Every structure is written in C-alpha cells, then in structure tokens.
Amino acid sequence: MNSESKCYRFYICFARLGSGMIAGLMPVHEIELSPEQASALDLLRSGENVFLTGGAGSGKSFLIRQFMRELDPKEMPILASTGAAAVLLGGRTFHSFFGLGIMEGGADATYERASKDKRLMSRLRKVEGVIIDEISMIPGQALMIAEALSQRARESKLPWGGMRVIAVGDFAQLPPVTHTGQRDWCFLNGVWEVSGFQTVMLSHNQRVSDNLFLDVLSDVRHGKVTERVREFLNEHVQDHDEDDPGTRLFPRKINAEKFNERKLAEIDETEVVIESIYSGSERHIETLKKASPIAEKLILKIGCQVMFLQNDPQRRWVNGTRGTVVDITADQITVRKDRGREVQVSKSSFAIQDAEGNIMAQVEQFPLTLAYATTIHKSQGATLDDLWCDLSQLWEPGQAYVALSRLRSAKGLHLIGWNPRSIIVDPKVLHFYKQFEGL
C-alpha cells in the first residue's frame, strides 16, 4: 500500500428507510484514502466545527458518507438545503429541523415563533450536532436564527449552544435560495465567524484526470474567461445532433421535460407506465409530491435511456450513471449501463421526515428517470460521461461551472453555444475563498 495514504475499513448498516431497524451489518472493501482525504477525515472526527469545501468532484460527499458510518444519525443528523435533496438523502431539511418554516414575518418573528416550540427546544438539546449539506444554499439569516435557537435551547452562550456543526458545500456552485432574490451568503453573516469553523479545502478532483480540463474548470469556477477557456469552449461548440445519446442539460425544467417526452415518443416500443406508490396522510403525501424528484408516474419503454437518481449501497451505480432499459417487470427493471454490465434494479423507498426524524410520507418507485435531459440544478452531484449544453443564456452564479464539472472527461462535452457573460461568480465568493489559498 502507498506509504502516503491511509487505509480504513468501513462497515455499512443497511436499513430499510423508515423501518428504524438495522437489517444487517457487513464489512465492505478497504478504502484507500489520499493524504488530503485522511487529514480531512481526522478533522471530522476531532469534535471541532468543520467547514468541508472544495470544487465539484473533490470528494466532499464521499468523505461525509465515510464519516456518517461511524455515527448515530439521531445524535448527528444530516440536514439538506432543499426538500428534493432531503428526499434523496432520507433526511430532513435544515429549515424543518430548526423550526424555521418559510421564515414568515422575518427573522425576529421566526425566532419568537420557533423559540416557543417545546419539541424544537427538546430536539436541539438532545443532539450532539448536525451536518448541513449544500451549505451554499442556506441563507445567512436562516443560519443566524438556527444558532440563536440552539443557544436558547441548550441554555448556553457558546456558539450554537455547544452543539457541533459540520457545514459541507461549495459556495462557487449554486447560491442560497431566498424569497427576496438577494444572495444572502451565510459566510457574510456574523454567525459564520462566531461558529469557529475549521476549514478543510479539498483540492484534488477525483472525477477528472485531464490537466487542461482541470485548469479550465478552475478558471470557470473563479469566473475567469481566460484565453484557454475561450479556446477550449470554442473547440467544443458544434451543431446540435438530435440523435447523439449524450444527456442534455437545460437551465429551465420545462425544456428538459419536453426534450425527454420527444425522445421517448421516437422509440417504437410499448409505453410502460409505473405508478409511484405513496403512503402517509393525504396532506403529507401532497408535500412529498411537491418536494420529491420522484415523479408520480415513471414512463419508460424498452430501449429508452435512463439515469440513476441515487447511489447504490452495493456500488453497482452512482447518482448520474446512465444506461438503456432492456427489460421491465413489475418488480424489477434491467438496465444495461453505458459503462459496464447489465444490472437489475428494484424499487426504493423515498420519504420526507418531520423535524423529529419520523416518516411523514413515503413513496416507492424505481430510482430512475429518463436520461435524455435534465436541468443544471438537478445535475448537481451527478457524474456524466457525455453531455450537451447551451451556455449562452445563463443567469445564476455557478451555473456554467456546475454544468461543465459534471463530466469525467472533456471528450464528452458538446456545446451548442456559449457566452462569456454566462460564466459568473459572485465577487464576494471569490474574496471569501482567497483566505483558504494554500490550505
């Protein structure tokens, strides 16, 4: 084994979502960590408040998965920034866990309302800490209220009342979600400095090995339209080939849906409609339908292109793996992966939880979606081998970077067009990350 790496043996607990019972305990293969990853894992284990960051493909999610295997999720819950992410994580949202709701009436009204919630106060006293996933999408005001509520619940003036906080994400990707349209970056709020985060900056891209592509991604992440960026993007511009199987990334949902419908209609096979099976109260099911990336009906045909929506515990696929449907039965779909063998896919359970971690509603469905097109936003976290994208009319900071950084290799990049004005980064984000250069 390489003397510059550490080797850890991890054990995975397999549990049916919502059952509360561990179904089995089994060893998995030893995982060799790079010095950077091993150092990051040591800091995660240290008990300090940690900010785990790095560009796309740097292994943030991988490290958190390893760390979580050592923990009781009741003592250290993982909190998602959006409802859709919470459904895929099998967790709770940041806003629901801290009783923030939609923050109606502003910060003061939200704090007063939440501080009177006895269940919330009890919940914040019981946990050892929280892991906040995709921290870039949490507004600063929400983080500030959550910290104040933690202090009140735990009757302590320590940051977060002594509760541990691990923040994970990349501020150079998608910005915070707010109702005002303002970018309320949480690192600009005073609570960020008070939290005393120890920063881990993962610098090695685990997804891409092409040095030129890595340099281009770095430039785009920093909002730099350098000569090499111009040359690189221009080289990949081509007329749209409707028959090419690569995934299309659109900035808007409606365009992705229409493209998927059109490509499915072109296949001369019988359409198979698989209804999602819901359980829970009617009200909670409606909430799940709005938040979930799982459609009410999965419509497929033999020969259609599909994409996996979640990582497989047995490592047969990851979020973003593509393949072709070769067989469909009531209980199983056989998919021939683009890069590998055929796999049999069973249904998964996806759920929304209340603030206490109890299942409110869940849905059973195959963890698949049509792969002809998706949105840039939904592609975050996915790894693609082939994509088509138009970078001409983007408007959000980080959109171009998220799109380009989905790829393993530049060989799979097809650009319909691009515009320098679409390569955007917030100057405040650039200034924030300068302090970590050299970490």
Swiss-Prot record:
Belongs to the helicase family. PIF1 subfamily. Keywords: ATP-binding, DNA damage, DNA recombination, DNA repair, DNA-binding, Helicase, Hydrolase, Isomerase, Nucleotide-binding. It catalyses: Couples ATP hydrolysis with the unwinding of duplex DNA at the replication fork by translocating in the 5'-3' direction. This creates two antiparallel DNA single strands (ssDNA). The leading ssDNA polymer is the template for DNA polymerase III holoenzyme which synthesizes a continuous strand; ATP + H2O = ADP + phosphate + H(+). InterPro entries: AAA+_ATPase, DNA_helicase_pif1-like_DEAD, P-loop_NTPase, Pif1-like_2B_dom, PIF1_helicase. It comes from Bdellovibrio bacteriovorus (strain ATCC 15356 / DSM 50701 / NCIMB 9529 / HD100). DNA-dependent ATPase and 5'-3' DNA helicase that efficiently unwinds G-quadruplex (G4) DNA structures. May be involved in resolving commom issues that arise during DNA replication, recombination, and repair. GO terms for molecular function: ATP binding; ATP hydrolysis activity; DNA binding; DNA helicase activity. Gene3D superfamilies: 2.30.30.940, P-loop containing nucleotide triphosphate hydrolases (3.40.50.300). GO terms for biological process: DNA recombination; DNA repair; telomere maintenance. Monomer. It comes from the Bacteria. Its cofactor is Mg(2+). This is ATP-dependent DNA helicase Pif1. The keyword Coiled coil does not apply. PANTHER family: ATP-DEPENDENT DNA HELICASE, ATP-DEPENDENT DNA HELICASE PIF1. Its EC number is 5.6.2.3.
